[in-house]
């Protein structure tokens, strides 16, 4: 913008904006109106275009200067004339131009693609920077939004501008109908009826973000407007704080539903609790003002009614004179976070707003979400454990240990179960191994093997052969036949070797077993039997054979 000062006697001085092809728009709105203002930035990227940057800026019109601002055509030469904004000399323009939106785009396949954007909005003006169009959306216009809105577009370093001069005027009053005069009857008197509100209404207007420097002082205002119909009421003004300096979220959400239902389970234990503001119970209360019995119905009731100040206020935060806003003095970098204002009327939340205060390094996007947050998969069930945002002046975090105890108990149960299964598998394997090596028909003999004679395979040696008797009824053990048993002659005694004789398998004649046998040096004399067996004694070999065959 250029400031024009007349060297001769002139009646005005002007603020001139040098524009490119898009010119100046003059928009006039009535107070409370809604509007959509086009920025007229029709862009056609060329083949050489690589980067496009768009920005909205705002220059506020000082109070009392609305009538001294106009749009006129200023000619630099005979062939170059452009529209410019002229401000009269009676208007003291001391305000600065502020950025309210910024977006960066890249050109991909001949079209724009958004890469980064940031918006500084309040509840009335919503700047929009899109790939094809840029607009200003006005909700319920107020005199405070009047001023000059400039759209800056940079295409590979070449700047273009589009200016909107916005003025807000009060709606014209409706003319009162004149009563008709009649000769015979007196004219009726009509009294205009003023609509009376039957309910209490609170409105807040404030910016949702502010970037500050370390050590800066400023005021955080919510612009509270009140309309109260009850003769007496109670109210509470609460300020909450949530630290966002350590958050790595691309988008921070503020759930409006949880402001009105702070004790809901999904609000107390939300999903991604570090990236959202849900229940005020999870935040730190930095200011709490209670009004017990107030009967003032104007907008100044917070400062006129008696109140009690509670809460642990920070050393760099002071309550403003109107007892609603906050004054920040020598603000440190640790004060970065989300500050939420809540107004309770007769115990119920009626109005709320938020502002993100941050340094340039910790700035993030904040979005208001009117849905219910999702419940976290693992939320804290012990009522003694509270989730509280740490104090902004103390750079400490509160460790949450409930989940550690739960996971350790779960891990211990798994280890015990695995150990029990392992022991059971080992026992079962041993049982299978014993069963596989066991002989089902083996007869266990507790006695050692005893040889009664020297083993030999000489056919001349008699060998006791156990034969199973034929299954004949005549030969049965229980047979009643009187047949006499035939007793064969007794066997001849085997020749005895002389003492100290060594039998070697190598010198043994053919047909021998080949066993090596050692005898004692002094052979023991065989005991003399008590009864000398008779030569013709009975032979029980057949009976023994039958018994053995039966026992076998």
From Swiss-Prot:
Gene behind the chain: gE
Region (Interaction with gI): 65-91
Stretches of the chain found on the membrane's Virion surface side: 24-410
Pfam families: Herpes_gE
Disulfide bonds: 249-275, 258-267, 294-305
SUPFAM superfamilies: Immunoglobulin
The UniProt record lists the keyword Membrane: yes
Protein name: Envelope glycoprotein E
Bilayer-spanning residue ranges: 411-427
Organism for this UniProt entry: Equine herpesvirus 1 (strain Kentucky D) (EHV-1)
Record: glycosylation sites: 47, 109, 122, 243, 293
GO cellular component, one term: virion membrane
Record's function text: In epithelial cells, the heterodimer gE/gI is required for the cell-to-cell spread of the virus, by sorting nascent virions to cell junctions. Once the virus reaches the cell junctions, virus particles can spread to adjacent cells extremely rapidly through interactions with cellular receptors that accumulate at these junctions. Implicated in basolateral spread in polarized cells. In neuronal cells, gE/gI is essential for the anterograde spread of the infection throughout the host nervous system.
Disordered: annotated segments: 473-515
């Amino acid at each position: 913008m250029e400031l024009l000062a007349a060297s001769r006697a002139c009646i005005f001085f002007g603020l001139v904006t040098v524009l490119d092809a898009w010119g100046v728009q003059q928009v006039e709105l009535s107070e409370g109106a809604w509007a959509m203002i086009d920025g007229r930035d029709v862009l056609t990227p060329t083949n050489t275009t690589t980067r496009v940057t768009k920005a909205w800026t705002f220059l506020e019109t000082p109070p009392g200067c609305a009538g001294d601002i106009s749009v006129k055509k200023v000619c630099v030469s005979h062939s170059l004339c452009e529209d410019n904004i002229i401000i009269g000399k009676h208007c003291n323009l001391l305000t600065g131009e502020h950025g309210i939106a910024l977006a960066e785009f890249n050109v991909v396949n001949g079209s724009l693609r958004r890469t980064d954007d940031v918006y500084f909005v309040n509840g009335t003006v919503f700047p929009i920077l899109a790939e094809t169009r840029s607009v200003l959306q006005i909700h319920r216009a107020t005199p405070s939004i009047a001023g000059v809105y400039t759209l800056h577009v940079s295409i590979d370093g070449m700047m273009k501008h589009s200016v909107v001069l916005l003025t807000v005027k009060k709606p014209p009053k409706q003319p009162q109908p004149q009563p008709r005069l009649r000769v015979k009857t007196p004219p009726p008197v009509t009294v205009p009826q003023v609509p009376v509100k039957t309910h209490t209404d609170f409105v807040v207007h404030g910016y949702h973000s502010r970037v500050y420097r370390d050590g800066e002082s400023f005021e955080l205002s919510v612009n509270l407007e009140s309309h109260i119909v009850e003769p007496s009421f109670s109210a509470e003004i609460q300020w909450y704080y949530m630290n966002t300096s350590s958050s790595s979220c691309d988008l921070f959400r503020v759930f409006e539903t949880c402001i009105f239902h702070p004790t809901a389970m999904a609000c107390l234990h939300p999903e991604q609790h570090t990236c959202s503001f849900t229940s005020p119970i999870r935040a730190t209360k930095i200011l709490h003002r209670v009004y017990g019995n107030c009967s003032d119905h104007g907008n100044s009731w917070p400062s006129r009614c008696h109140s009690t100040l509670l809460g642990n206020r920070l050393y760099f935060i002071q309550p403003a004179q109107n007892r609603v806003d906050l004054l920040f003095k020598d603000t440190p970098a640790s004060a970065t976070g989300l500050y939420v204002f809540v107004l309770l009327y007769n115990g119920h939340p009626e109005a709320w707003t938020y502002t993100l205060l941050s340094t340039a390094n910790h700035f993030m996007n904040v979005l208001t979400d009117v849905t219910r947050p999702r419940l976290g998969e693992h939320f804290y069930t012990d009522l003694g454990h509270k989730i509280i945002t740490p104090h902004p002046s103390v750079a400490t975090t509160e460790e949450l240990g409930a989940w550690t105890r739960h996971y350790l108990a779960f891990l211990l149960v798994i280890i015990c179960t695995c150990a029990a299964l392992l022991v059971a598998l080992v026992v079962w394997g041993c049982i299978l191994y014993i069963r596989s090596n066991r002989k089902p028909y083996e007869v266990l003999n507790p006695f050692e093997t005893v040889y009664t004679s020297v083993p030999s395979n000489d056919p001349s040696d008699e060998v006791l052969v156990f034969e199973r008797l034929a299954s004949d009824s005549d030969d049965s053990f229980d047979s009643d036949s009187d047949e006499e048993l035939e007793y064969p002659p007794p066997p001849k005694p085997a020749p005895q070797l002389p003492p100290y004789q060594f039998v070697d398998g190598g010198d043994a004649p053919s047909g021998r077993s080949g066993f090596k046998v050692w005898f004692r040096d002094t052979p023991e004399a065989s005991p003399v039997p008590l009864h000398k067996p008779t030569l013709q004694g009975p032979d029980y070999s057949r009976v023994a054979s039958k018994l053995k065959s039966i026992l076998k």
